[in-house]
UniProtKB/Swiss-Prot annotation:
Keywords: Cytoplasm, DNA-binding
Gene that encodes the chain: ybaB
Single GO cellular component term: bacterial nucleoid
Keyword Mitochondrion: no
One of the Pfam families matching this protein, by short name: YbaB_DNA_bd
The organism of origin for this protein: Helicobacter hepaticus (strain ATCC 51449 / 3B1)
Record's protein name: Nucleoid-associated protein HH_0332
Localization terms from the record: Cytoplasm, Nucleoid
Length: 108
């Protein structure tokens, strides 16, 4: 039988977990380097760029700088996406699979 109280408690818990996850993402720092460390880009877990470091030797070589910057940005973007997917899977796994609140039977 459907249990609205259980569903409400589960949704409240899920909202708290999502808020906690968002706060942790703000604190998570992901970085990528290219050109053997000549260019470095750091983002937080929400994908906001928080730091870019460029070696002075690249400042007069615009084309190389552009290529290395694009590479580092793409790599850190991929890291952010991987982190988001991992966090979402952890969130999903932490929710449990008790279908009794919907009147169904759990798998297994």
């Amino acid at each position: 039988m459907f249990d609205a109280k259980q569903l409400g408690a589960m949704l409240g818990s899920m909202q708290d977990t999502i808020k906690d996850l968002q706060e942790r993402n703000e604190q998570t720092i992901l970085s990528a380097k290219s050109g053997g460390g000549l260019v470095s880009v750091s983002c937080n877990g929400n994908g906001e760029v928080i730091d870019i470091s460029i070696d002075d030797s690249l400042l007069e070589d615009k084309e190389s700088l552009q290529i290395l910057l694009m590479s580092a940005l793409n790599d850190v973007r991929k890291s952010v996406e991987d982190n988001r997917q991992s966090s979402a899977m952890n969130l999903f796994n932490g929710l449990g699979t008790d279908l009794n609140i919907f009147g169904g039977k759990p798998n297994g």
